[in-house]
Amino acid sequence: MSGNSIGQNFVVTTFGESHGVALGCIIDGCPPGLELTEADMQHDLDRRRPGTSRYTTARREPDEVRILSGVFEGKTTGTSIGLLIENTDQRSQDYSNIKDLFRPGHADYTYQQKYGLRDYRGGGRSSARETAMRVAAGAVAKKYLKQVHGISIQGYMSQLGPISAETLDFSQIEQNAFFFPDASKLEALDEYMRELKKSGDSIGAKISVVATGVPVGLGEPVFDRLDADIAHALMGINAVKGVEIGDGFGVVTQKGSEGRDLMSPLGFESNHAGGILGGISSGQPIVAHIALKPTSSISVPGQSMTAQGEMAEVVTKGRHDPCVGIRAVPIAEAMLAIVLMDHLLRHRAQNQDVRSHTPILGMR
């Protein structure tokens, strides 16, 4: 199975399954000298961790990360960083009834057809449990980006089902279980989720992620454009079915006179492009959005088939998130951080000595 690594200069490779012994990752390319401990990663892992609220899966995993290599006396050495998280709360018996049954909307059928066998326990490698290691690796990237380049990354839920944020208050994001920036909608979100859980159904969500302080010049046209790599990374998150950069699909109804980001010596007057022009960062905030589908692991009966080709009914048991978007915020942050880290190192390798006489623009 290929496709377990991302990046060229900052390379993250993950391994492990939902109900396996452990999850792990190897980070190659992290510069030496970065102060790093498990605590630097644990905060984001706790934000993603299951069982932290009544709106997420009841599976309780401490997700305590261990550094196995690449750090000496509290600093990165420039060699491969090995990270490990043990699985401690598997209940594989919950999945014994679907050993030969395909859950509609999941990867069961496609994994079976591609590999000729599959780990049916919680989806195995296709489970979002794997994203814990992406968050750990992303936390390393986030620390380097912030400490060395002053880049900050913040994600939030901008929409859950029919409920959208109408105001954006970053101080509210970490104060509620939804990572929602509009405090006036929290009661409606709570009521909506309570009714959803009663019905045994699930719902989709939209997650937004913003990176500020990104310098001009990141991105490698034409095939490694910054927005292309961001889209690639975000689409690699479980359940993501759509990615937008800047105004995204909203540009369909825009006129050229409306959507262009006008410039002056004082800076850009807008940011419809989401901080990327021609595949290269413009110095403005990078803005991306992802759409996550509702999980198909629900207690509402549905039609499917067995591995032997017989008709069957599926009622999913086990512990699942009624809205996977709630825990996707730190995952989206991590994937954006990994891409920015990779492109910073690539830019440094080729363009470190480039000096432009054009003034650097900011936001007015």
Swiss-Prot record:
Names of required cofactors? FMNH2
Which residues does the annotation say bind NADP(+)? 48, 54
Pathway(s) annotated for this protein in UniProt? Metabolic intermediate biosynthesis; chorismate biosynthesis; chorismate from D-erythrose 4-phosphate and phosphoenolpyruvate: step 7/7
In residue numbers, the region (Disordered) covers 41-60
Q: Which residues bind FMN?
A: 125-127, 238-239, 278, 293-297, 319
Gene Ontology MF annotations: chorismate synthase activity; FMN binding
| Database matches in CDD domains | Chorismate_synthase (cd07304)
What's any GO biological process attached to this entry? amino acid biosynthetic process
Q: What is this protein called?
A: Chorismate synthase
Q: Can you name the source organism?
A: Shewanella sp. (strain ANA-3)
